Amino acid sequence: MNESAVYWSRMLTELTLSFHILYATIGVGVPLMIMIAQWTGYKNNDEHYILLARRWARGFVITVAVGVVTGTAIGLQLSLLWPNFMQLAGQVIALPLFMETFAFFFEAIFLGIYLYTWDRFESQKKHMLLLIPVAIGASMSAVFITIVNSFMNAPQGFDMVNGELVNIQPVLAMFNPAMPTKVAHVLATAYMTS
């Protein structure tokens, strides 16, 4: 690969990741804020907080949509621009990549149910419970993708012998030395950003 191609590949990946991290970070903490607003409205019988939760939920859909588009673009870029890394990742660290996808779908399904069931429950409390899987899915999505990132910073769980991957241990790759601090940092900053 020539140096110009590497440079432009880095720039394109950096640009896409810059947009994605903004929306993804907001998307981790906002479900908790919506839940707090709806809970406050329910507990105090205050329609203003219920309306606030409803409007935040609609805005949250936009952040999720932009996150989906940029996340999909990142997946394509990793496959097309960095195939050697993806060959290694596919054999060693694919488990958290798949788990991140599952966590996202978990979040998206319950977000859809939450949005389309306003005023269909006899109690706001029951409706608010739908936000729990949304918040869990958003947080777990961040955890799993951060595990992949921590692997990139402290790779372990495999041996390279004569250019071949051997002794692959996906769980060891997931729980690498960088994982605890990176996951804690990402979750804390995502909640604080929101």
Enumerate the language-model features and the residues they cover:
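Polytopic transmembrane helical bundles with strong interfacial aromatic enrichment
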Residues: 1-194
